[in-house]
């Protein structure tokens, strides 16, 4: 393994001063809430994947911990300047994290959370032990690509390499190239990028004649299981990674994929100031549903230079949020009826506000951030960290603080309130908000 030296990565984070108000106080409050949440994890779930705040118990995804929260949260600590907490988390990771476990893991989830988190933290710290862990994980995930099409199976056993789960979706197949490509760049081993790029290309070439994809496909046969197209969970980050692959790796094919894909999405899925569902083959509208996961799209549109569309859609997302004082998982945008009432501490609407502020410097996106933050504190804060909501209508609490709350939700709020912490145009965020260098 030959690592490139990116140890000065943190130096590019400090820049300029904010142009309005007192961003330091807002960002410091977010930092305080991060610490509040992290200390709850330390007290009740240390060494485990996630915290259940109400029951004060840990949760492990697969029966044995892969340190999801520490790995996911480490680069947030580094960005926030929480050096003591970062050192403690990094020590836990390098001393205790092992992937030599008989666990069938979801390739997508461990890639965006663990591989992405290890790579970004390595780039920030220069600690080669983090890159070694990333390379070990990458090697253990490679057997997932051994399908007849080259599109990865949904699960792989970390110890045996046995892959399973032939029915997958575009997001799980196409949201690997940033992490695997970065691993190739840092280790000078092209196999990771090649496997992920081939999978993305195989999926893309199965788009319909009008340029849309469905939301379920068999990776062994290459046949679509569901022809429903949308921009929500199951398809979302497939689109996002086409754009970001083109930007991060200057990849012509990825750029072309994004241009053609987003053109089809805008033509057939856009519905006024919303994006709905349609049949991938005919473009016929099949549903008028939109939700928390769909709210990634304004960020992608802004990054892709389609600012007007991005701004209109973020305004729609904000209306969805304000209707109940926090966003539901899914609504019918024609009736504004809640279809799925939970709130999972998701970051996407905040991510989009951050991207739009960086793209326009319009203070209203910071004002949106204040609404998001105030509502989070009002409805999701517990005596021990933050938790999901079972219903945004009744505000009944769930009992989980997902690792992405520390990796994404609070990170994007912090960066929205204090752009000095990171130079936006020098990094590309993976879909778990782990910044990777150009």
Question: Where in the sequence are the language-model features?
Answer:
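Bacterial N-terminal signal peptides
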Residues: 7-16
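Glycan-recognition and catalytic cores of secretory/periplasmic carbohydrate-active enzymes
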Residues: 20-438
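Positively charged n-region of N-terminal signal peptides that target proteins for export
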Residues: 1-5
């Amino acid at each position: 393994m030959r690592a490139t030296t990116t140890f000065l990565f943190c130096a590019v984070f400090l820049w300029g001063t904010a142009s309005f108000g007192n961003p330091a106080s807002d960002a410091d409050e977010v930092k305080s809430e991060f610490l509040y949440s992290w200390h709850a994890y330390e007290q009740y779930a240390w060494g485990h994947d996630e915290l259940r705040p109400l029951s004060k118990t840990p949760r492990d995804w697969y029966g044995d911990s892969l340190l999801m929260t520490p790995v996911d949260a480490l680069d947030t600590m580094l960005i926030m300047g929480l050096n003591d907490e970062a050192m403690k988390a990094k020590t836990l990771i390098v001393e205790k994290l092992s992937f030599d476990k008989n666990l069938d893991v979801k390739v997508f989830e461990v890639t965006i959370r663990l591989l992405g988190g290890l790579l970004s933290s390595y780039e920030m710290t220069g600690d080669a032990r983090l890159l070694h862990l990333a390379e070990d994980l990458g090697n253990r995930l490679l057997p997932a690509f051994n399908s007849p099409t080259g599109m990865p199976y949904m699960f792989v056993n970390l110890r045996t390499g046995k892959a399973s789960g032939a029915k997958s979706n575009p997001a799980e197949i196409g949201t690997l190239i940033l992490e695997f490509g970065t691993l190739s760049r840092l280790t000078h081993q092209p196999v990771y990028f090649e496997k992920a790029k081939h999978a993305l290309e195989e999926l893309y070439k199965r788009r319909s004649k009008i340029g849309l994809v469905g939301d379920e496909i068999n990776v062994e046969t290459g046949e679509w299981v569901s022809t429903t197209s949308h921009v929500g969970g199951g398809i979302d980050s497939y689109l996002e990674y086409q754009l970001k692959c083109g930007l991060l790796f200057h990849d012509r094919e990825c750029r072309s994929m994004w241009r053609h894909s987003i053109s089809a999405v805008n033509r057939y899925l856009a519905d006024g100031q919303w994006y709905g569902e349609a049949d991938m083959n005919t473009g016929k509208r099949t549903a008028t549903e939109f939700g928390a996961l769909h709210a990634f799209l304004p960020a992608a549109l802004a990054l892709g230079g389609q600012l007007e569309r991005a701004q209109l859609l973020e305004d729609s997302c904000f209306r969805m949020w304000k209707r109940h004082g926090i966003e539901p998982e899914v609504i019918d945008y024609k009736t504004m009826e809640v279809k799925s009432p939970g709130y999972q501490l998701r970051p996407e609407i905040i991510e989009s506000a951050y991207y739009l502020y960086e793209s326009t410097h319009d203070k209203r996106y910071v004002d949106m951030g204040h609404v998001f933050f105030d509502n989070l504190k009002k409805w999701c804060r517990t005596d021990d960290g933050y938790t999901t909501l079972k219903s945004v209508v009744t505000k009944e609490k769930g009992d989980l603080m997902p690792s992405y709350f520390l990796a994404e939700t609070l990170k994007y709020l912090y960066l929205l309130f204090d752009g000095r912490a990171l130079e936006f145009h020098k990094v590309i965020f993976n879909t778990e908000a782990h910044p990777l260098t150009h």
